[in-house]
């Protein structure tokens, strides 16, 4: 029944939205806002306009509608006192249709108060354009700089029109309020771009100046600036906060769109809760109210329910114009139909204007649409009434095949290989997209459309729609909201609601704040124990300063990972901004406020324990000031890191920048480089460094006004025991000759240039920094739109791109309009399609034949069960079947019937549960160890490495999965053959890439199939939902491809979800499972599925209508479609049928006869893997190296971090002198060299996880290569890059610091330089192995990063720099000895500092007076000879003493002996080996499936 012939009353009565007894079904309702109060005259006009049966019929419809409305109470459903159960969303009798009618009548009762609004859209000459690159080359490490430089220069040049191409060619359309429009086209046709343009969501492309778009008189600028939430674009992806419940997610959206004019006495909370409940009841989500939304990694609602949450959230925005981009993705056809009915009802009753781009649209769904837009490569080839589109194209000369849906027919016209002209019209119909458009623009339908649009534009200019709409918009807004604002509630109300949502997120996953607080407490205990109970003496001055410095360092570091949560939330915040729910700045401010309690608890849990265990100044005032400054440090650094995150577009860039900034702040805080020793060029850094002011205040707070007993005197030791005090001096800076104490104030003044008067001043400066960075962060969030989405392009290697462009130029002959833009790879012209079809049928390489398969795989009584909540549940129940060469068997069933489970059981891929009964046989024999290598399994997900080309992916599979006896040339020839067979020649050298920049959906699916085919599966090919998520034409082409493979002798078993009649015709047999994994049918389909139809009709099914889709009819018959019920149990019908007996007899016959055939006794056929281990290892390692090489972002971010940090440290400590502070600085330069450790690991982890995902999801189950080859390849392939990085770091750090100069006196510059290079490169190799160890036993990157950070922090603390072995408590001494950094630092310091002379700076000399009658030589000489150091005699007779004269004395004090440098290097290398061994062990322990499920079954 077409839309044109459907009256309003029929829509309301014959297609009810909701079955009151089934709250789980998707019910028809969409969009609640002030548009509900349109007057009856508008409704009558629309009805009259839409009717094809005359005015009398329309009048009857209107009268009937008014009669229905008279029965509606028109009461407010929001006040909580709901007298009608049909209006209560929590009632089982809730009726969404009744609820909407009631709401409409309520609004009509006081239209002046509710101020209803509606919005249509019309456009003429609409053109969208972007950069003319539908193909580009993949940057590598060698050409990336050149590419980025040329792109930057091109941006600075005057725009060149030749660089742009039209995504949407000039087009015209009008969508009036109350009309539902569908947009049809193949992927890349411009459907998404059209919807984004209408929704004023044009970031990433441009709109032509000649384009005219009006929204009932409003311009796109008006919509973007003032009414953004009234015109929305809903993307096909589902992004939500995973730890927020469904109810909280929808109530949050409802609160932010709650209007001011919601009715008297109704508070916002009541209104929002009621609206959210209505939507949950309408879309069958009520039972999920308290369930987390979840995502791919967090358990939550199902994928289909998550899609419905997205739909409900978008609907709650109350938008007048809704642009839905493939919103039915992930929904089965019945649920999708219910959603479209909801859109239709929304348009009909509430006068909304929905547009939807949809794939695989059923006929029932299509008949609900008022208008249809058909796009072909960016050209609009039709716009008009949906009921007239088919007739238009048939009149053009195209044939619509029997049982093909209208939507599929319209879309198929844009596919040259699929469309079919009527006899006699072969030379008359248009062929190219431009010819189709020319035909359309010369048609009378187009002339009528342009006339209607022109009249609409004139009407918009005459009417005062803008002011009326503004009044309606302002009436909805809360108090203190600017009338020009697109938001419904005020800024501070937005902040309040987002704060509440953030607390709910914490409640949904309290583990994150709890673990953060507990980890801070544990780290406080561990770190404080290192400096435990410091004595109040001068020999603890360095350690006391080090303890304060590390507390600042830890508090600053604690906010670094906030960048990750910022990027995680950014897509959701951007979506909500487009829905006009709240400003990004409101979210920024709210996130800081909501996280403040957790931050304060974190600082308390660390700092309270740390402060008192270290024995810092124990007075209340000093403690609270310390805690105040540490909390301020956390806030300042949090705001700074957030600002960096807000100004960048990638996590890698943000983390690298943050690390360099943090490094600068630590070095110039005043401890690592005290102010007197900061070089002149860099003094400005300390003035803009907030950590400098914080550290100075903490040092003043600890030392000012205190006296410390001297811990060590000069001279001291044997012979000086009874020396009077006036003749000795304390060794500490700031000491006074003859005094037994040192003034703390004097010490920090002379050693650090810290002044007590700066204490509270610095606090004020810190607060100013916090406010400044807060303002910067909040402001930046408003302007950062994230990485710009590029158009769909295909990436090649640079050399391959040149060949591709030459080929494209030759085929297009310079005319961009002659075919696809810039040689677009998605489409071919008709001649190419025909030629390619003929070419591939013959095969391009006559010497290569498809593997002949004569073996038959069959199974009998297969039963599988899993344990769920301590209960064994049967998933498959005695399933029988077979797959023969040359046949395609379809595996169908309802969701949850066990289709994928059956595939996994048949292919031996089950990882849980037990096969309790049944046999799986090949030619009558049990499965052997080579079975998994003998099959191909095409998974539903297309999992590939993004930097691999199509040809490389196929070659990799062929090299490792084909027999090792076959030569490389033969394998390469076979790969070429499969490329031709799958019609992938045009993009064989293209990279897989990512969505938008790489292969499209169809090309990825073909590659997935190809990877399995090149393995030469001699037995059969499994395909799991190969058409899922594809448009109907792509699904059809995949099925044609399967048919071609079967015709070449391949046996195929394929699961498929509700196929069209055309797709069903490609299958030979059907195995249908009903709920519980029970067989309802197994047998031939027959021509037009007649054999299957006859079977069900024979056993009592209603006859199949001639025009019906047999698949959908069968689903209705067996009760597998939503809302349908079977007349009988078809499992029992099957088991008692003669057809079942025939199947059993055939299985028994095959077992008896086939088992007599000779078996393949080739020993290689029984191997678990086709290739030997060494070959697996080499190929996997090389692939990983190539992946890194083609990921210049990864390599350059690593290089930039290494070069910037090494140079920064090197020049900050530039040619440090060999005095007391200089030695200290050189040691801390080594310490700071290790600080970027965690960032190196954070950069590496995502790439490891990408490889692991491909291996574990696809390559491991197919026995491509072993787990040992995978982990070994990952480890060793990273080492060459680390050696290069270490070499660069060596030159950037070692020479600027000046350590090489210490080797000059002993003429050992070369030997010590080589050892230093080995040490530094070993450090970088260690970082990669540590990262791989952390991720080897963790599923999530965050957990691995946290583990690595914790281990790294402990290594730094116990390495002997901040606290030596003589200070570390005895309990922790094992941490010092088993710490790899201990030996590395000792080796680096001994190699860099040994055997050099020390000369104290003047401020480092201590002065003392010799006893009466003695000279400096006689008095101090014996001491310096025994203890080391040197002295000089001053003019006044006093002695100036430097306590050391050789770097070896300093090295001995920190246990870094030059004689042990090679031993220490060897120990550190051993730690690298331990990392590698543990990585392999933990990967095997945590990730490799153990045991043999076949053995378990036999037990």
From Swiss-Prot:
It holds the Pfam family PDR_CDR. It is a multi-pass membrane protein. Residues 148-402, 857-1101 form the ABC transporter domain. Keywords: ATP-binding, Membrane, Nucleotide-binding, Repeat, Transmembrane, Transmembrane helix, Transport. InterPro entries: AAA+_ATPase, ABC2_TM, ABC_trans_N, ABC_transporter-like_ATP-bd, ABC_transporter-like_CS, ABCG_PDR_1, ABCG_PDR_2, Drug-R_PDR/CDR. The keyword Transport applies. GO terms for biological process: xenobiotic detoxification by transmembrane export across the plasma membrane. PROSITE patterns: ABC_TRANSPORTER_1, ABC_TRANSPORTER_2. Belongs to the ABC transporter superfamily. ABCG family. PDR (TC 3.A.1.205) subfamily. Multidrug efflux transporter. Confers resistance to azole antifungal agents, to other antifungals (terbinafine, amorolfine) and to a variety of metabolic inhibitors. This is Multidrug resistance protein CDR2. It comes from Candida albicans (strain SC5314 / ATCC MYA-2876). The gene is CDR2.
């Amino acid at each position: 029944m077409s839309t044109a012939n459907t009256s309003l009353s029929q829509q309301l009565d014959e297609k009810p939205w909701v079955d009151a007894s089934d709250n789980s079904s998707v019910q028809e309702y969409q969009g609640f806002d002030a548009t509900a109060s349109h007057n009856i005259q508008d409704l009558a006009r629309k009805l009259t306009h839409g009717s094809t049966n005359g005015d009398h019929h329309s009048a009857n419809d209107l009268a009937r509608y008014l009669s229905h409305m008279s029965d509606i109470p028109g009461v407010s459903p929001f006040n909580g006192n709901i007298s009608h159960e049909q209006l209560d969303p929590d009632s089982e009798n809730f009726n969404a249709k009744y609820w909407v009618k009631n709401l409409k009548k309520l609004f009509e009762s006081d239209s002046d108060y509710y101020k209803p609004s509606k919005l249509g859209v019309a456009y003429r000459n609409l053109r969208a354009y972007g950069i003319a690159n539908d193909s580009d080359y993949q940057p590598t490490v060698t050409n990336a700089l050149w590419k980025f430089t040329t792109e930057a220069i091109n941006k600075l040049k005057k725009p060149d029109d030749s660089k742009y191409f039209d995504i949407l060619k000039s087009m015209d359309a009008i969508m009036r309020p109350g009309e539902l429009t569908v947009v049809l086209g193949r992927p890349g046709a411009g459907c998404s771009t059209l919807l984004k343009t209408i929704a004023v969501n044009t970031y990433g492309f441009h709109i032509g100046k000649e384009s005219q778009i009006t929204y009932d008189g409003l311009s796109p600028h008006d919509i973007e600036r003032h009414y953004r939430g009234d015109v929305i674009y809903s993307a096909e992806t589902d992004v939500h906060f995973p730890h927020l419940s469904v109810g909280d997610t929808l109530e949050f959206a409802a609160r932010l769109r709650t209007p001011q004019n919601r009715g008297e006495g109704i508070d916002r909370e009541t209104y929002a809760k009621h609206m959210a409940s209505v939507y949950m009841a309408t879309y069958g989500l009520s039972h999920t109210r308290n369930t987390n939304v979840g995502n791919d990694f967090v358990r939550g609602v199902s994928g289909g329910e998550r899609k419905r949450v997205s739909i409900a959230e978008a609907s709650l925005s109350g938008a007048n114009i809704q642009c839905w981009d493939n919103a039915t993705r992930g929904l089965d056809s019945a649920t999708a139909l219910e959603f479209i009915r909801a859109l239709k009802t929304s348009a009909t009753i509430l006068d909304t204007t929905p547009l939807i781009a949809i794939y695989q649209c059923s006929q029932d769904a299509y008949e609900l649409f008022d208008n249809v837009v058909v796009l072909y490569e960016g050209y609009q080839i039709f716009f008009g009434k949906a009921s007239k589109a088919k007739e238009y194209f048939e009149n053009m000369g195209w044939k619509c095949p029997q049982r093909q849906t209208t939507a599929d027919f319209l879309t198929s016209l844009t596919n040259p290989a699929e469309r079919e002209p009527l006899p006699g019209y072969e030379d008359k119909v248009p062929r190219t997209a431009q010819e189709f458009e020319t035909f359309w623009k010369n048609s009378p339908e187009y002339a009528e459309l342009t006339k209607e649009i022109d009249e609409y534009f004139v009407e918009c200019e005459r009417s005062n729609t803008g002011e009326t709409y503004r009044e309606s918009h302002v009436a909805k807004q809360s108090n203190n909201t600017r009338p020009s604002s697109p938001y419904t509630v005020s800024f501070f109300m937005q902040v309040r609601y987002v704060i509440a949502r953030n607390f709910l997120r914490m409640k949904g996953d309290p583990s994150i704040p709890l673990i953060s607080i507990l980890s801070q407490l544990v780290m406080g205990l561990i770190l404080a124990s290192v400096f435990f109970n410091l004595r109040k003496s001068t020999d603890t001055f360095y350690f006391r300063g080090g303890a304060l410095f590390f507390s600042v360092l830890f508090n600053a570091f604690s906010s670094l990972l906030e960048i990750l949560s910022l990027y995680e939330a950014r897509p959701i915040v951007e979506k909500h901004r487009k829905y006009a729910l709240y400003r990004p700045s409101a979210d920024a401010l709210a996130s800081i406020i909501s996280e403040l309690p957790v931050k304060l608890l974190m600082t308390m849990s660390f700092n309270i324990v740390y402060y008192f265990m270290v024995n810092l100044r124990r007075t209340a005032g000093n403690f609270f000031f310390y805690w105040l400054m540490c909390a301020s440090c956390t806030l300042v650094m949090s705001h700074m890191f957030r600002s960096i995150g807000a100004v960048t577009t990638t996590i890698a860039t943000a983390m690298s920048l943050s690390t360099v900034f943090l490094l600068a702040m630590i070095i110039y805080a005043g401890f690592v480089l005290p102010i007197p020793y900061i070089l002149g060029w860099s003094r400005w850094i300390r003035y803009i460094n907030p950590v400098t002011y914080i550290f100075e205040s903490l040092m003043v707070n600890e030392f000012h006004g205190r006296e410390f007993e001297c811990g060590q005197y000069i001279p001291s030791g044997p012979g000086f025991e009874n020396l009077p005090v006036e003749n000795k001096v304390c060794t500490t800076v700031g000491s006074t000759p003859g005094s037994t104490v040192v003034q703390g104030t004097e010490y920090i003044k002379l050693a650090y240039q810290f002044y007590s008067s700066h204490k509270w001043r610095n606090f004020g400066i810190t607060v100013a920094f916090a406010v400044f960075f807060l303002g910067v962060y909040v402001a930046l969030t408003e302007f950062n739109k994230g990485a710009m989405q590029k158009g769909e392009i295909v990436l090649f290697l640079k050399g391959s791109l040149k060949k591709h462009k030459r080929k494209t130029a030759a085929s297009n002959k310079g005319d961009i309009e002659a075919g696809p833009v810039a040689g677009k790879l998605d489409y071919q012209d008709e001649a190419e399609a025909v030629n390619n079809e003929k070419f591939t049928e013959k095969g391009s390489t006559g010497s290569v034949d498809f593997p002949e398969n004569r073996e038959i795989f069959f199974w009998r009584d297969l039963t599988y069960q899993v344990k769920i909540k301590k209960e064994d549940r049967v998933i498959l129940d005695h399933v029988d079947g077979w797959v023969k060469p040359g046949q395609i068997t379809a595996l169908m069933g309802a969701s949850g019937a066990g289709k994928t489970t059956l595939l996994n059981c048949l292919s031996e891929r089950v990882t849980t549960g037990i096969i309790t009964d049944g046999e799986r046989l090949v030619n009558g024999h049990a499965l052997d160890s080579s079975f998994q290598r003998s099959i191909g399994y095409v998974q539903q997900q297309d999992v590939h490495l993004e930097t691999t080309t199509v040809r490389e992916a196929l070659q990799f599979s062929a090299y490792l999965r084909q027999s090792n006896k076959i030569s490389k040339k033969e394998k390469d020839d076979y790969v070429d053959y499969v490329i031709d067979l799958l019609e992938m020649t045009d993009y064989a050298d293209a990279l897989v890439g990512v969505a938008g920049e790489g292969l499209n959906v169809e090309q990825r699916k073909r590659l997935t199939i190809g990877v399995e085919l090149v393995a030469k599966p001699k037995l059969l090919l499994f395909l799991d939902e190969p058409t899922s998520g594809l448009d109907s034409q792509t699904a059809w082409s995949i099925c044609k491809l399967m048919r071609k493979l079967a015709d070449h002798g391949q046996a195929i078993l394929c699961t498929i979800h509700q196929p069209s009649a055309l797709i069903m015709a490609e299958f030979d047999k059907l195995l249908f499972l009903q709920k519980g994994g029970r067989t309802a049918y197994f047998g031939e389909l027959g021509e037009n599925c007649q054999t299957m139809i006859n079977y069900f009709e024979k056993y009592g099914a209603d006859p199949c209508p001639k025009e019906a889709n047999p698949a959908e009819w069968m689903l209705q018959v067996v009760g597998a479609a939503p809302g349908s019920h079977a007349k009988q149990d078809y499992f029992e019908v099957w088991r008692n049928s003669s057809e079942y007996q025939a199947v059993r007899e055939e299985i028994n016959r095959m077992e008896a006869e086939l088992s007599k055939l000779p078996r393949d006794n080739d020993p290689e056929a029984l191997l678990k893997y086709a290739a030997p281990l060494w070959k697996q290892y080499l190929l996997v390692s090389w692939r990983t190296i190539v992946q890194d090489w083609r990921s210049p972002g990864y390599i350059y971010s690593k290089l930039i971090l290494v070069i910037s940090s090494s140079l920064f440290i090197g020049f900050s400590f530039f040619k440090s002198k060999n005095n007391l502070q200089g030695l200290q600085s050189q040691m801390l330069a080594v310490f700071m060299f290790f600080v970027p450790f965690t960032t190196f690991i954070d950069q590496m982890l995502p790439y490891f996880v990408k490889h692991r995902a491909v291996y574990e999801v696809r390559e491991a189950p197919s026995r491509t290569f072993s787990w040992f080859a995978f982990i070994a390849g990952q480890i060793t392939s990273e080492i060459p890059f680390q050696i290069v990085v270490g070499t660069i770091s060596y030159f950037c750090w070692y020479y600027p610091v000046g350590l090489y100069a210490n080797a000059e006196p002993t003429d050992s510059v070369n030997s010590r330089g080589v050892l230093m290079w080995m040490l530094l490169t070993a450090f970088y190799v260690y970082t990669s192995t540590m990262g791989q160890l952390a991720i080897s036993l963790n599923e999530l990157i965050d957990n691995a990063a946290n583990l690595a950070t914790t281990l790294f922090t402990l290594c730094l603390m116990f390495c002997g720099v901040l606290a030596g072995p003589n200070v570390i408590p005895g309990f922790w001494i094992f941490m010092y000895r088993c710490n790899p950094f201990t030996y590395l630092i000792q080796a680096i310091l001994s190699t860099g500092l040994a055997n050099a002379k020390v000369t104290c700076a003047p401020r480092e000399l201590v002065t003392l007076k010799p006893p009466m009658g003695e000279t400096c030589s006689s008095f101090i000489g014996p001491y310096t000879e025994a203890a080391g150091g040197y002295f000089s005699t001053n003019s006044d007779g006093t002695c100036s003493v430097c306590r050391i004269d050789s770097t070896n004395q300093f090295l001995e004090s920190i246990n870094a002996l030059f004689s042990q440098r090679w031993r220490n290097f060897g120990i550190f290398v051993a730690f690298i080996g331990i990392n590698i061994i543990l990585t392999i062990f933990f990967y095997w322990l945590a990730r490799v499936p153990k045991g043999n499920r076949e053995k378990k079954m036999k037990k």
